[in-house]
Design a protein with these regions (language model features):
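Conserved beta strand-loop-helix elements of the APE1-like EEP
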Residues: 177
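Nucleotide and nucleotide-moiety/phosphate-recognizing core
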Residues: 18-174
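Eukaryotic N-terminal low-complexity, Ser/Thr- and Lys/Arg-rich leader segments
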Residues: 1-24
Length: 177
């Protein structure tokens, strides 16, 4: 069982009330540029239930997003995967789930740069104006569409211009990715 706790910081927000537009338009930035130094191989490419770990994550993100967001006429999804050194091996997997792909040429600079690259790409290229962006890492094979749906729902239910939703899990409500 998972628990989603919504965090909202509106102290400096010009908006005092939640936006009344429903459904909200949510994009996804998938971080798949990790170097897997401790593991010694790319975790996202490991086998998982007949496919790869990355297939499981992409499937969960796609399923949870589809359950949460009303599709528009555009067939281009507001999804981007940010790759690193394994770009050529990861690209065919993520594109099969509707993700555009951009490569972080400097993955050693960390996730922050990959997030910035992904967010910039979505803001500049999304087929629809976005109200929020869900960021995920690509090595969580136990991620489910239901958890993704809960995170998006918590965001939608608590939306202000500076809403941040942090998923929590376990008895101690540890922060998740």
């Amino acid at each position: 069982m998972s628990y989603v706790k919504a965090k909202s910081n509106t102290a400096f927000s010009p908006m005092r009330d939640p936006i009344d537009r429903r459904p909200l338009h949510i994009g996804i930035v998938l971080l798949v540029g990790g170097q897997s130094k401790r593991m010694g191989c790319n975790k996202q490419l490991l086998p998982w239930r007949g496919k790869t770990v990355l297939d499981a994550v992409c499937g969960a993100l796609h399923c949870g997003w589809n359950d949460s967001v009303e599709l528009t006429e555009s067939c281009k999804l507001p999804f981007v995967a940010v790759t690193g050194d394994d770009h050529e091996r990861l690209e065919p997997i993520v594109t099969s789930y509707g993700f555009e792909v951009v490569q972080n040429e400097h993955p050693n600079r960390g996730q922050g740069l990959s997030i910035a690259i992904g967010v910039r790409h979505l803001v500049e290229n999304s087929p629809i104006p976005l109200d929020g962006i869900l960021c995920s890492v690509g090595d969580q094979p136990l991620l489910t569409g239901n958890v993704v749906h809960q995170v998006i729902s918590a965001f939608s239910d608590n939306f202000h211009s500076k809403t941040i939703v942090v998923p929590h899990y376990g008895a101690n409500y540890q922060s998740g990715n």
